[in-house]
Amino acid sequence: MSIGILGTKLGMTQIFDNKTGVAIPVTVVQAGPCPVTQVKTKKTDGYESIQVGYKTVKEKALNKPLLGHLAKAGVSPLRHLIEYRLEDASAYTLGQEITADIFQEGDLVDVAGTTIGRGFSGYQKRHNFKRGNMTHGSKNHRLPGSTGAGTTPGRVFPGKRMAGQYGSTQVTIRKLSVVKIDSERNLILIKGAVPGKPGTLLNITPAKKFGK
């Protein structure tokens, strides 16, 4: 139960370690600022949490109930809202901005986002199935093979790997290292790759799992 931040993936680049000179591949994320739009307490809601928003939009992009909710917090219209549960939310106030400063260099974070959508894909591309022979009279090139038994059970079991929508799913990459923080521009440089293409919405939170 700890606070995170919403951000946008800008792309990938590399930076060099000052001591070893080794190139480090990093993803640049525009993190926040995320104003607090609601503070929940045990007295009013039964649990402690804060709700934050991200990405300013025009008023016509939101409905009236949401505009009224944001007006109570005294913030401009925001596209995305997310809630973080806390043990004690008393330290936060409406309108307070959450910035990239909540993380430090060397921190481990979990990054959640939507992967790149690749449309309807076949067995080899989606599940890495082995294809059949391309010559020697083979008529099985990219077919899936057997999908189950015959009359009994007389159906294909749920979960069978088949062709279908590939990508465009919610994925969390865990225990990525924060390489650098740019407080002035609210940028976070994260070692390695994160889900999605440039422009993807990301949810960055402190790592929940530790160890190998």
UniProtKB/Swiss-Prot annotation:
Coiled coil regions in record:
none
Transmembrane intervals: none
InterPro entries (alphabetical)? Ribosomal_uL3 (IPR000597), Ribosomal_uL3_bac/org-type (IPR019927), Ribosomal_uL3_CS (IPR019926), Transl_B-barrel_sf (IPR009000)
Alphabetical GO CC annotations of the entry are: cytosolic large ribosomal subunit
Any single GO molecular-function term of the entry would be: rRNA binding
Q: Does the keyword Zinc apply?
A: no
RNA-binding as UniProt keyword: yes
**Which intervals of the chain are annotated as region Disordered?**
131-155
Top-level taxon in the UniProt lineage: Bacteria
The protein's UniProt keywords, in alphabetical order, are: Ribonucleoprotein, Ribosomal protein, RNA-binding, rRNA-binding
One Pfam family hit: Ribosomal_L3
Biological-process GO terms, alphabetical: translation
Instruction: Extract the HAMAP family matched here.
Output: Ribosomal_uL3_B (MF_01325_B)
Q: How does it assemble?
A: Part of the 50S ribosomal subunit. Forms a cluster with proteins L14 and L19.
* NCBIfam families, sorted: L3_bact
In UniProt terms, what function does this protein have? Answer: One of the primary rRNA binding proteins, it binds directly near the 3'-end of the 23S rRNA, where it nucleates assembly of the 50S subunit.
What family name appears in the similarity comment? Belongs to the universal ribosomal protein uL3 family.
Protein name per the record: Large ribosomal subunit protein uL3
